[in-house]
Curated annotation (Swiss-Prot):
Keywords: Aminotransferase, Transferase. It holds the Pfam family GCV_T. It comes from Bordetella pertussis (strain Tohama I / ATCC BAA-589 / NCTC 13251). One of its GO terms (cellular component) is cytosol. One of its GO terms (molecular function) is aminomethyltransferase activity. NCBIfam families: gcvT, PRK00389.1. The gene is gcvT. The glycine cleavage system is composed of four proteins: P, T, L and H. This is Aminomethyltransferase. The glycine cleavage system catalyzes the degradation of glycine. It is an enzyme of class 2 (transferase). It catalyses: N(6)-[(R)-S(8)-aminomethyldihydrolipoyl]-L-lysyl-[protein] + (6S)-5,6,7,8-tetrahydrofolate = N(6)-[(R)-dihydrolipoyl]-L-lysyl-[protein] + (6R)-5,10-methylene-5,6,7,8-tetrahydrofolate + NH4(+). One of its GO terms (biological process) is glycine decarboxylation via glycine cleavage system.
Length: 366
């Protein structure tokens, strides 16, 4: 018998709003509240909000916290020196495969926060504890399941958050992208997101999130589900763990080589040896379909260099055509013509540099 689905503190709000709920990594989450298309456009044109409380915030502290994170992840947290600054990184296994992709916030040398994906949270915590124990790091790894998280995204997102919480504006208005600030006790506002739009991700005590959700709703922020979240992240060229990469995929095979910091030879992060010995056999590219049809994950792609495969695909609400990501033979370049097999027919597609959409506008591809 399967375990019951986990629920976020906003579950009743979703049901009251008529959300279609689905199993997402063992969590009961909203797919859409009505029109997925309207939710997508709300984020691109105005403001939408997502319940992301299924994701786990993990506090990492202790005398060796910085050294531990420099060992744990492929990007180098030593580049973070300003409290509240963050970076994106992959956490690798010894073979160089991606255990998870994370955002890491710096507050002090002995005070960090790591945000991990919902479906990998238990695995991630176990791995973090294993690395800490193996190398004898003096660290405390504290999963914060007492916290909830709401992402408010779109060109008007920040203004609507401030309208709902005027006291937060002074601390959060100066934030640069990938920075966070405490706006009140126990509440962190970060200028981050997963949509390609401006906005905030707000981390706060679980018992305060329902009131925040209702106050944002009163300001005209539209609730959005996983369906819109997926089309938005695809347009923005952002990977989804478990679909575009996993433990068998190296960062270079997922377009994430920019997250691997190799400059400091003395920093032997987990997976570094495998990364340094690895000759990239695949390229990770964007595809835009040139005829009618919708690309989906696992569809074959053929090109002059050989065969590839789609990892993600959808119909882009902003562009009105199907877009996707594919792992292809090395040598495939933006502008190349390829073909995707859709229902037994080979349909032409254009290789594109990511993203497809930036700040609500189509990125030109020739």
């Amino acid at each position: 018998m399967s375990a019951p689905l986990k629920r976020t503190p906003l579950a009743e709000e979703h049901l009251a709003a008529g959300a279609c709920m689905v199993d997402f990594g063992g969590w009961d989450m909203p797919l859409a509240y009505g029109s997925q298309l309207e939710e997508h456009h709300a984020v691109r044109q105005d403001a939408g909000m997502f319940d992301v409380s299924h994701m786990l915030n993990v506090d990492v502290g202790g005398a060796d916290a910085t050294a531990f994170l420099r060992r744990l992840v492929a990007n180098d947290v030593a580049r973070l020196a300003t409290p509240g600054k963050a970076l994106y990184s992959c956490m690798l296994n010894p073979q160089g495969g991606i255990i998870d992709d994370l955002i890491i916030y710096y507050f002090a040398p002995d005070q960090w926060r790591v945000v991990v994906n919902a479906g990998t949270a238990d695995k991630d915590i176990a791995w973090m504890q294993r690395v800490a124990a193996a190398d004898g790091f003096d660290v405390v790894i504290a999963p914060r399941r007492d916290l909830a998280m709401v992402a408010v995204q779109g060109p008007n997102a920040r203004a609507k958050v401030w309208a709902a919480r005027p006291a937060w504006q002074a601390a959060s208005e100066p934030l640069a992208p990938f920075s966070a600030a405490a706006v009140e006790a126990g509440t962190l506002v970060a200028r981050t997101g997963y949509t390609g739009e401006d906005g905030f991700e707000i981390v706060l005590p679980a018992d305060a999130v329902v009131q925040l959700w209702r106050d944002l709703l009163a300001q005209g922020v539209r609730p959005c589900g996983l369906g819109a979240r997926d089309t938005l992240r695809l347009e923005a060229g952002m990977n989804l763990y478990g679909q575009d990469m996993d433990e068998l995929v190296h960062p270079d095979q997922a377009g994430l080589s920019w997250t691997v910091a190799l400059k400091d030879e003395a920093r032997r992060f987990v997976g570094r040896d495998a990364i340094e010995q690895f000759a990239v056999p695949r390229a990770f590219v964007g595809l835009k379909l040139q005829e009618r049809g919708v690309m989906r994950a696992h569809m074959p792609v053929r090109c002059a260099q050989g065969m590839g495969e789609l990892t993600s695909g959808t119909m882009s609400p902003t562009l009105g055509v199907s877009v996707g990501f594919a792992r292809m033979p090395v040598g495939v370049q933006p502008g190349d013509a390829v073909e995707v097999e859709i229902r037994g027919k080979w349909v032409p597609a254009l290789v594109c540099k990511l993203p497809f959409v930036r700040h609500g506008k189509a990125v030109e591809h020739s």
